[in-house]
Structure formats: structure tokens, C-alpha cells
A protein has these predicted regions:
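Terminal helix/beta-alpha structural elements that buttress the NAD(P)+-binding lobe
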Residues: 1-162
Length: 162
């Protein structure tokens, strides 16, 4: 999600910041993020910056922390994360927190718009792999720990003689 969101935002000439761990920052800069922040060293919610759109793939921040990072018309979009935090964000919206907006995304909506971008190479998937399928248990942990960059891809051996 993050790598596609970056590419789509850059097509619209947006300035895009990325927040992740130190091991990924160099790759994120190479992908085109204008600024990268290591959340272990710096709290982006305390920088005083305001954003028009935040796409969050982890949902580890409180509604209060998130609200202070958005412009008055800013939007916060989450695509996964801790269910307890998601519920708290819904309650924050209903309780009148000024900058919180809830945006529901429908699966596979707008795929027809993305297909030409993918087929022409204007939108490129970022692949972490391929990894052998025998590494599946390790890869599940690797993915769960958030150490991957892009989509984790495994090779599956072909059946011969069938």
C-alpha cells in the first residue's frame, strides 16, 4: 500500500514524507520519499508539521497524536493495524475531534484506473523477494515484524510430469 500510495502521490506532484524504521530509510529515499523519518529516533507527531493526507499502514498512534498532525481539512486513512486503535479512532471521530475524518475504502475499487499505469510501467510494484516457499514460516514472521519493503513474494515449485 505504501509504495503504491507514494507513486500515486508523486504523480500528483505531492511532497511525501515516510515514517518507518532505520533499516528501511535508505530504500524509502531511493523510492522517492521527499523526507524520511526514523520513528525510533524522532516522533513525527511532535514536529509541528501539518499534513493534508496521512496514509497509515500500522495504526499505532492515538487519535490525539494523529489529529495534531493534520491540517484543518486533512484526511487520515488507515489500511490496517491494531483493531483497538481503529475502534478508538472511530470514537474520536464521533466525539468531535476537529481534524479526524474516517475514510472507508472499498477493496478493488478503481482497479480499472490502476491497470493502465501498471501495464505502462508508470506504477511499479516494489517486490521483496522472491523467496523460496520453504522459508514461509520465517517470511510470516518477517512480514509480521514489518521488516519487509514492498510486497513479500515467494516462489512456488512447479509440478513436473502432470
Amino acid at each position: 500500500v505504501g509504495t503504491f500510495a507514494l507513486q500515486l502521490a508523486k504523480r500528483q506532484a505531492c511532497i511525501v514524507w515516510g515514517v518507518d524504521t532505520g533499516g528501511k530509510l535508505e530504500a524509502m529515499s531511493a523510492m522517492g520519499f521527499d523526507r524520511v523519518i526514523d520513528y525510533r529516533k524522532q516522533d513525527f507527531t511532535c514536529l509541528g508539521e501539518r499534513f493534508d493526507l496521512m496514509v497509515d499502514t500500522k495504526t499505532k498512534r492515538t487519535a490525539r497524536e494523529l489529529a495534531r498532525t493534520l491540517t484543518p481539512d486533512g484526511r487520515y486513512v488507515t489500511v490496517g493495524g491494531d483493531p483497538g486503535r481503529l475502534i478508538a479512532l472511530l470514537f474520536a471521530r464521533w466525539s468531535g475531534r476537529r481534524n479526524m475524518r474516517i475514510v472507508a475504502l472499498k477493496s478493488n475499487k478503481n482497479l480499472d484506473d490502476l491497470a493502465p499505469l501498471l501495464s505502462t510501467g508508470a506504477l511499479k510494484p516494489v517486490i521483496d523477494g522472491p523467496h523460496p516457499s520453504s522459508d514461509a514460516p520465517r517470511l510470516i514472521r518477517y512480514f509480521g515484524e514489518g521488516r519487509h519493503t514492498g510486497k513479500v513474494v515467494m516462489t512456488v515449485a512447479e509440478s513436473h510430469g502432470q
